[in-house]
Amino acid sequence: MVSQCGRVHPREITQLYKEKGFSGIVVTEHYSPLTFTGFSRVFPQKRIDFYTSSYYEMKKYETEDFSVLFGMELRHYGTGADYLIYGVEPEWLKEQGNLMFPWEKKIYELMHSKGYLVFQAHPFRPYILRCNPNYIDGVEIYNGKTPKSENDKAYEWAKKNNKLMVSGSDFHTKEHIGRGGIITNERIKNNSDLIRILKSQDFEMIKSY
């Protein structure tokens, strides 16, 4: 895995999710100072092939019944806040500069110019700086690695600010398999389907307490 906290090979991840009955996965590796080291910490755009490598490896095991979609989990310099970006494509990412430099407003405007969605991930973890809700589309109101009390606060914050909601597994090890996600009435085959369904909120949240 690209993210330092990942512990499972991409091929095994796809197999585990297929066995669990999922019809797809969004690969959101950490795009953060912890992922890029040395020279690439300042110029991560020079190592986008490295950053996208897990996605392309998992893509090899995509089938008619199982989709592998690209996303990202972005963190700015000097903050612990993480942002899940849905809809983003590897080809577009290769054309960008260092996305850890722009602050939340500029990132929001940049992503919206392409039709992507920005969700704040696990916003009530102790070290997280919650963003200005004007600069996100949604909130991860359930995170598979986060205590219920913190997830409940995330739900209330999203509801108060009229934000889209999503559930995520935050998969790092085998123990996290299937802890979060969404159940939809139709299979999500690509990022266009994903964006449309996230905007509609026509799905059921997976929550595993």
Regions flagged by a language model, labelled:
Residues 50, 117-123, 165-167:
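Short, hydrophobic beta-strand segments that form beta-sheet elements in well-ordered domains
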Residues 1-105, 134, 138-166, 174-176, ...:
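A metal-dependent hydrolase metal-coordination microenvironment
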Residues 7, 114, 119-131, 146-149:
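Active-site-proximal loop/helix segments of hydrolase catalytic cores
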